[in-house]
Regions:
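Long, positively charged amphipathic alpha-helical accessory segments at protein N-termini or as interdomain linkers
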Residues: 1-29, 35-38, 42, 143-146, ...
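N-terminal lobe of the biotin/lipoate ligase/transferase fold
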Residues: 2-155, 163
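Short, solvent-exposed coil/turn segments
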Residues: 50, 75, 127, 173, ...
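Short loop/edge segments at beta-strand edges and connector loops
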Residues: 83, 172-174
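Short connector loops at helix/strand junctions that flank enzyme active sites
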Residues: 103, 127-131, 173, 183, ...
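Conserved active-site carboxylates
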Residues: 177
Length: 327
């Protein structure tokens, strides 16, 4: 554990701590403490400095704790926790490529990502100690093609978990965003390595907004919300992650056995754009049509406005077509 994370542990109680005392505890100079505080502030922690009193982490912080997570879950997955990491997905993908001998279900958690990313290379804001950043390793024997609908299933697991902590119902935006009241609260990134018809290795990345700091909110270019904003009480991330791991395991086992056969109707019941006119943007073209939901393969069903012909779409970005009137 590096000194930056040790400083966070000291400040997590929300009280003032002098730079001198922190330095003595860690065996470093006050100048070094000041440098670490600056770095921590730059990655999203609201740390105040008052002459004569020291440093204070506004509101305190409940840090992730693997023992606590395991106490609230009956799963035996291998769990790793990093205070700071470039990307949990990148880390697992690097282990896959180095043939590290990962065990199915191996899960990486982090307090902060310095290079967090979503689909299509978009940046995922990952401030320290604020949200859930999780990546899980899985294997499938039936090839890459069989994993094409997995992000749909994972979206359901995430939505089901969030629904346990709030009275508001989550909606699902194809292919892998979770919304509450039309605002994004979670995203999923599934990456794969392997053979078309043989064994494939999967990394399931999940990012969930729990308590967004103001300093990070300014960098988000779309409507968003977080769990503390829509819940009646503050969320313990350790309890939340334990419930999430259980949901991920249940949904993954169901997907392994039956793909989306028993899941797609539940997804359609929570489709954020059900029967609305949407615009689908892909690398090659744009389409406008009515969103009819998904089929058993996870393909988006898009009805042409003029011809009423329904096409199946397997890739792209969906957004509401607000300027067009619904039929």
């Amino acid at each position: 554990m590096d000194n930056k994370h040790k400083i966070v542990q000291i400040l997590a109680d929300g009280n003032f701590h002098s730079g001198e005392v922190i330095g003595e505890q860690l065996g470093i100079s006050r100048a070094a403490v000041s440098g670490h505080i600056k770095t921590l502030s730059n990655i999203g922690l609201d740390i105040y400095s008052i002459t004569g009193k020291g440093y204070q982490l506004a509101g305190g912080l409940t840090l992730l704790n693997l023992k606590s997570i395991r106490q609230h879950s009956n799963l035996t997955n291998e769990l790793e926790l990093f205070p700071i990491i470039p990307s949990t997905n990148e880390y697992l993908m690097s282990l896959i490529k180095s043939k590290n001998g990962l065990v199915d279900g191996h899960t990486i958690l982090a307090e902060c990502q310095t290079k967090g990313r979503g689909r299509r290379g978009k940046t995922w804001q990952s401030p320290y100690g604020s949200h859930v950043y999780l990546s899980q390793y899985r294997t499938m024997d039936s090839g890459l093609s069989a994993a094409s609908g997995l992000s749909i299933a994972i979206g359901l697991a995430v939505a089901n978990t969030i629904n346990q902590f709030t009275k508001l119902q989550c909606q699902l935006k194809w292919p892998n965003d979770v919304l509450v009241d039309g605002k994004k609260i979670a995203g999923i990134l599934v990456e794969a390595e392997g053979q078309t018809d043989g064994v494939c290795h999967l990394v399931i990345g999940v990012g969930i907004n729990i308590n967004m700091p103001e300093s990070s909110a300014d960098y988000i270019e779309q409507p968003w919300t977080d769990l503390n904003n829509i819940s009646d009480e503050l969320i313990d991330r350790n309890v939340f992650i334990a419930k999430l791991l259980q949901q991920l395991d249940e949904v993954y086992q169901e997907y392994q056995l039956h793909r989306l056969d028993n899941l797609y109707e539940q997804w359609n019941d929570n489709n954020a754009f059900a029967n609305l006119t949407v615009e689908l943007s892909s690398v090659t073209k744009k389409q406008v049509g009515k969103c009819l939901g998904i089929d058993t393969n996870g393909a988006l069903l898009l009805e042409d406005i003029s011809t009423k012909v329904v096409s199946k779409v397997f890739g792209g970005e969906v957004s509401l077509r607000k300027k067009l009137k619904e039929n």
